[in-house]
Amino acid sequence: MGHFSSMFNGIARSFSIKKAKNINSSKSYAKEATDEMAREAKKKELILRSSGCINADGSNNLASVFSRRGEKGVNQDCAIVWEGYGCQEDMIFCGIFDGHGPWGHFVSKQVRNSMPISLLCNWKETLSQTTIAEPDKELQRFAIWKYSFLKTCEAVDLELEHHRKIDSFNSGTTALTIVRQGDVIYIANVGDSRAVLATVSDEGSLVAVQLTVDFKPNLPQEEERIIGCNGRVFCLQDEPGVHRVWQPVDESPGLAMSRAFGDYCIKDYGLVSVPEVTQRHISIRDQFIILATDGVWDVISNQEAIDIVSSTAERAKAAKRLVQQAVRAWNRKRRGIAMDDISAVCLFFHSSSSSPSL
C-alpha cells in the first residue's frame, strides 16, 4: 500500500509540474480531441443515454440499461454507456446518476454529459505525461486512473457550481462510474448507488460480490468528517434508521448520502464529491456487473439482483427486468411510501457461448 501511495503521489506531482509548463494549449487541444471522439461515437451509435441495449460489432461487452420514474415527480435518475471509450476497442465507460432536490434532474444529466469527456481528457493528459515501467505496470495504470477520476470529479463539481443555467445550491446528484479496460474494471463512486458483481464460486453457483460502499452519513468515517466540519447527522422521528446530513443550525438539507456533486448549501459542512476509486480484475468466472441507484437496493438484495439478471432469457432486457422486479418489491415491502426512481445498468463481460456453465 505504501508503494502504491508513493507511486500515486509521484504521478500527481510529476504531472502537475509538466502540465504547468503548457497548461492552456494542451488542455484546449485535449478538450477538442475528446469532444470530437464523443461526436464520432454518437454518430456510430456507440453512446447510449436512454433505456436500451448496446453491443458493438466484435465486442464481448453487452450493456443493458433501463430507468423508471418513481412517484415523486420527474425522473431524476439517468445513465450512460459509451462503447469503444476514447476510440479504444477494449474500453467501455458506464455510469449511473441519481439526482435529488428541485434541480436534481438537470444536475444528474449535466454530470452524466460532462464526466465521461472530462475523465477521458484527464486520463489521456496524465497518460501522455507518465512513463509506465514494466515491473509496476498494473499499479501505475491504477494510479493514473485514480488520479484522473479524482481530478475529473473536482473539475465537474467546480464547473457545476459556476453553471449559469443550473441552480445546484440545494440540488445534487450521486455518480457511480466504471471503465472497463481489457480485463480490468476501474470503479469510481460518489454517493449511495451500488456496483455488484456476479461471479461463479468454487462450488459452481453464481454469487454476488459488492464492489462499492454505500456512502451513507452514519458510516463512521463519513460521520466523523461531517461532524468535524460542524455538520450534523441524525434521523427524523418519522424516518427511524434513515440518517441524513444537516446544517449546523437549520433543519436542511437532510441529505441521505454523504458524498454528492452539487449541494453547495452543505459542502462546507462535510459533504464531499471525492470518489472512492477501486479496481477489479475480471476472470472467466466473472459474468456481469450491475450498477443501480438506491431505488433498487432499498428493496432488492445483492444476491436477488444477480439471480434476476442471470435468469433473464434475453440479456438485452436484463436491466428492464431487474427494475420491474424492484418495482414489485417496492409495492410489496414499502406500501404507502412514495416509490423512488429506479434505474440499472447491466454490463455482461463475455459472450454467452464463452461463459462457464453453472
Swiss-Prot record:
Any one GO biological process: regulation of microtubule binding
Cofactor binding description: Binds 2 magnesium or manganese ions per subunit.
Family annotation (SMART domains): PP2Cc
UniProt xrefs under SUPFAM superfamilies: PP2C-like
Reaction equation(s) it catalyzes: O-phospho-L-seryl-[protein] + H2O = L-seryl-[protein] + phosphate; O-phospho-L-threonyl-[protein] + H2O = L-threonyl-[protein] + phosphate
Positions with a binding annotation for Mn(2+) 2: D98, D294, D340
MF terms in GO: metal ion binding; protein serine/threonine phosphatase activity
Any Pfam family hit: PP2C
Stored PANTHER family: PROTEIN PHOSPHATASE (PTHR47992)
Protein name, as recorded: Probable protein phosphatase 2C 34
Organism: Arabidopsis thaliana
Lineage: Eukaryota, Viridiplantae, Streptophyta, Embryophyta, Tracheophyta
